[in-house]
Structures are given as C-alpha cells and as structure tokens.
C-alpha cells in the first residue's frame, strides 16, 4: 500500500492557484492544515484570520456574497462548535459557496477532547443547504477540492492530513458510492 505524505498540500495548490475567485482562509493553523506552502507562494490569495473562528465564518460569508469561493481551513471542531451562529447566519442559510476544510475529524487528534470533532457530522447535516463530504484515503484527499467546488452551496469536508494511505484508484465524486467489499447476507 502506498503512503502519501501531505496529499492535501499539493492538491489544494494545484486546484486553487489559477482561480482568482478562490481564496485560502486560515484560522492560524497553516502548517497543521497543510496550507503553509500555499501561503508562501500565493500570499495575495491567502487570508489569515487568526484564532477568531466566529469572525472567520462571517468574513467568509461576505466573501461568498462578493463572488469569491473561500476555502476555510481549521481543525474540524473549530469550524462548527464556537462559530455556530455565524456559520448558520453567514454561510448556511444564505447558501454561500464556502468550502470548510475540517482537519482531524472524530477522535484522530492527539489534542484531547477539546480538539475532537465527534459530533461534526450530526451538527453539519442539520444545517440548511450544507453538504458533508468525507475523505477516506489519499486519492479522495487529492480530489476533495474539485468535488466540493462542484456543489452549489456550502460544503463541510472531513479531512485527513499527514501521511495518508492510498486505498482507491478513482477520485471522489459527489453522489457516487464505493463498494469496499461484496457481502453475502
């Protein structure tokens, strides 16, 4: 099995570098979300909001209103728990084309309970107009930007980071399922 180191870093840069309407939004987790290289090479397309997730959601909603497509980067738990009201009012209800890249989904984080996004799917699925996508391997991480950007409305992506195994040959496609194995029951 092939292991791919930081697949999102290259995939996001390749996807966003020539699209002026796509902006990279960061919650002060550039390296942890694998966007530090993009920040360094495309500073005119990079906005650091600091550890101000509530402001980041409202600001990104405004960017969406102005015709931009913000790709918001943070740990999953920080994209919905604290900024919930702003996420609902500025992004979900008005159906802004914001792409929320939530890294360290579930209990994959070494940061303890404050960093665990254990209810993110249930919270995000209850929001109007919100689509939730899940990455399962390096191929899906590499194709998540295109998949998310194909949706007319807000998208929350559960992101893998670091060294990620490659399990699938074909990219993630919205609305298509994968058969992992055939059963007989």
State what each model feature region is.
Residues 1-164, 168-177, 182:
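Thiamine diphosphate
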Residues 185:
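Gly/Ser-rich, acidic/histidine-flanked active-site/gating loops
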């Amino acid at each position: 099995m092939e292991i791919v180191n930081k697949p999102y870093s290259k995939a996001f840069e390749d996807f966003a570098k020539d699209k002026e309407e796509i902006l990279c939004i960061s919650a002060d987790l550039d390296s942890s979300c694998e966007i530090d290289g993009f920040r360094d090479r495309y500073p005119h397309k990079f906005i650091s909001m600091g550890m101000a997730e509530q402001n980041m959601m409202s600001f990104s909603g405004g960017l969406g209103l102005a015709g931009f497509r913000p790709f918001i980067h943070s740990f999953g738990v920080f994209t919905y728990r604290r900024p919930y009201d702003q996420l609902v009012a500025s992004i979900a209800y008005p159906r802004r084309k914001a792409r929320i890249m939530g890294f360290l989904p579930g209990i994959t984080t070494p940061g303890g309970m404050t960093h665990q996004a254990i209810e993110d799917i249930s919270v995000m699925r209850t929001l109007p107009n919100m689509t939730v996508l899940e990455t399962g391997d390096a191929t899906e991480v590499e194709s998540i930007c295109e998949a998310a950007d194909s949706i007319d409305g807000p998208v929350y992506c559960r992101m893998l980071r670091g060294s990620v195994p490659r399990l699938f040959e074909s990219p993630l496609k919205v609305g298509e399922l994968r058969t992992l194995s055939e059963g007989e029951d």
